Amino acid sequence: MNWTLASPEIVLALCGLVILLVGVARNRREDTFLCAMLTLGAFLVTGLLTVSGALGLGFQGQFVADPFAVMVKLLILSGASIAVVLSLDYNRHHGMERFEFPVLTLFSTVGMMVMVSASNFMTLYMGLELMSLAIYVLAAFARDELRSAEAGLKYFVLGSLASGLLLYGISLIYGFAGTMDFSALREALAHPAGTSPGLTVGVVFVIAGLAFKISAAPFHMWTPDVYEGSPTPVTAFMGTAPKVAAIAMMLRTLVTPFHGVLVQWQHVVALISVVSMVWGALAAIGQTSIKRLMAYSSIGHMGYALVGLAAGSQAGIRGLLIYLVTYVFMNTGTFACILAMRRRGRQLEKVSDLAGAGRTDPALALLLAIFMFSMAGIPPMSGFFGKLYVFLAAVQAGEPLLWGLAVIGVLTSVIGAYYYLRVVKVMYFDDASEGPFEAWPTSVSVVAVGSAIFTALFFLFPAPILAAADLAAKALLR
């Protein structure tokens, strides 16, 4: 039974080892494409196993497979697959055709899937470190670029600090509760004598460690430099799948064992949410690099997502999951458009480089405008519905704290709309200083168009995603 529950993770890890052996044995630059295709195949097989696999608790209560884990894992696999597709042309063009890229992405994905199914703090930490160590290397994958090496080093140093905070919090929880198992913690906290100030401090440290992984303010200091310095496909990857995994881990960690003490951690999450929304909205206004703009944008988006977590209700969890689905596709679509910004063999990253794109590159301008409107929360784009369900959950909770969160969220969305619409203004109303961009690679076109279709037409078919999110929320609160 244990092996059946973890079959997606086991199969994906074994596939990673096989692909690694293939890459090492052949060790030819042209085999990078083969390894990437094998990785995508492994992701597909893992996705099928995840959907059709058994549900339950295994490995002596340390691993859980439930509808919540299934939905989040499929979202993680989607984000990882898109990142591998985006890397195909980019790595070849920048002399980074090495088989290690898809392999590292694969092992990072294994760690994320373990995190999502963790029902014990030790399992959680093992998955977190497997994910993080692979991403540290990916951030510095462009070895010949100084800023990429700087991004990897900065992410590693600050990530180690965050892991230390998380471990310290776990040790406090274990010291005061005597267990690291989520179900045992929930039973212990059901009694009035089960809570203590030391346990609360431990939970706060755990929240701080996980907030770093989702780049929520004030634990966001690594985000702008790492986003800008990392290769763009890596930025697209770390901006989606790892954040989905980390915020899902926050959900399972806080809702499953600590739902009985919601009041004690709700204010901490609400504070992080407010700071993230405000800082993300204000700091992005003056950015000239579109990758740094996306970094601050992601900080704000995580603030909006945390509104659903602060609600702590089924509606809040459902809203958060819907938000994550919309976030992944509009984010990866935006980075696909950034990868299409290339002239004379040089990758461009400035907002000003988009000047006049509405006339010189109408397809790129249209797709990027769709993603900008969605991130701003303008209907009928998918980003509007993501924010709508999160804010509705906060309002329906009926608490003054959550009402305040919803109001701040709406206000910061209005502020944030300025820098998203500024990109649209530059594309359609500024004069073009240079000619059109180079022809799009097929891989970039597929991701950009597919993400745009999902983002623009989400309102026509929301039912399957709403139903899956509702089922996942019920499973988490069960």
UniProtKB/Swiss-Prot annotation:
One GO term in the molecular function aspect is:
quinone binding
A single GO BP: ATP synthesis coupled electron transport
**Does the keyword field hold Translocase?**
yes
Q: Which reaction does it catalyse?
A: a quinone + NADH + 5 H(+)(in) = a quinol + NAD(+) + 4 H(+)(out)
Keywords for this protein: Cell inner membrane, Cell membrane, Membrane, NAD, Quinone, Translocase, Transmembrane, Transmembrane helix, Transport, Ubiquinone
Q: List the subcellular locations.
A: Cell inner membrane
Residues in coiled coil: none
EC number(s) per entry: 7.1.1.-
Top EC category: translocase
Q: Membrane spanning segments where? A: 5-25, 37-57, 68-88, 99-119, 121-141, 156-176, 199-219, 231-251, 268-288, 293-313, 320-340, 365-385, 401-421, 446-466
Per the record, membrane topology reads: Multi-pass membrane protein
UniProt similarity note: Belongs to the complex I subunit 2 family.
Give the record's subunit note.
NDH-1 is composed of 14 different subunits. Subunits NuoA, H, J, K, L, M, N constitute the membrane sector of the complex.
The protein's job, in short, is:
NDH-1 shuttles electrons from NADH, via FMN and iron-sulfur (Fe-S) centers, to quinones in the respiratory chain. The immediate electron acceptor for the enzyme in this species is believed to be ubiquinone. Couples the redox reaction to proton translocation (for every two electrons transferred, four hydrogen ions are translocated across the cytoplasmic membrane), and thus conserves the redox energy in a proton gradient.
Q: What is this protein called?
A: NADH-quinone oxidoreductase subunit N
The scientific name of the source species is Granulibacter bethesdensis (strain ATCC BAA-1260 / CGDNIH1)
